[in-house]
């Protein structure tokens, strides 16, 4: 009986750990702002676009590196699909973060001083349907 209880306790502990890993990703210490998500420092917001009432896509720059974060304003705390995207024109290198998050997607960063970029993001409803998406094509070229 004692071995059965030990095995049952181990099974429950393992199941609880696995269940925790199945839930959507969320930063251990969620950033307090889009700039903080990019790492703070010399990053500053150079553009932003509202995703209806579901979130805002922020483009930040520090003199050499572009950083994009999609910040949720609806279903905050609920894991939903959120995307942040940036692509460099010179070689079409793209960086994307597209997962279920509770607060924001990103940061996605790319070095592109003096180069055009595509940047944007999207949010989804809890059902998985796209709530809002927006992308700016070949902009911020200087």
Q: Where do the PLM segments sit?
A:
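N-terminal prepro-regions of secreted/extracellular proteins
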Residues: 1-44, 49
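Post-signal peptide N-terminal regions of Sec-secreted extracellular proteins
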Residues: 30-142
